[in-house]
Every structure is written in structure tokens, then in C-alpha cells.
Amino acid sequence: MENFQKYLSTAPVLLTIWLTFTAGFIIEINRFFPDLLGLYF
């Protein structure tokens, strides 16, 4: 039960850190290559 409570307390923290890193990475890629994410039809 103690391990489960530890998991519940660390998973949101790890998720927040991972999403922050991913968002920052996408923003930096979009800063250097601004047209990379655009779709042209």
C-alpha cells in the first residue's frame, strides 16, 4: 500500500515535468524551423 501511495504522489509530478519538457521542445523547434509544423495542401 505504501508503494501505491508513493506512485500516486510521483506520477503527476513526472507527468507535469514530461509535458513541460515536451512543450518547451516543440516551442524551440518551432522557433528555429517555423514552417516545419505547417501543413500545405
Swiss-Prot record:
Keywords: Chloroplast, Membrane, Photosynthesis, Photosystem I, Plastid, Thylakoid, Transmembrane, Transmembrane helix. The chain crosses the membrane at residues 7-27. It is a single-pass membrane protein. It is found in: Plastid, Chloroplast thylakoid membrane. The keyword Transmembrane applies. GO terms for cellular component: chloroplast thylakoid membrane; photosystem I. The keyword Plastid applies. InterPro entries: PSI_PsaJ, PSI_PsaJ_sf. Belongs to the PsaJ family. PANTHER family: PHOTOSYSTEM I REACTION CENTER SUBUNIT IX (PTHR36082:SF2), PTHR36082. May help in the organization of the PsaE and PsaF subunits. This is Photosystem I reaction center subunit IX.
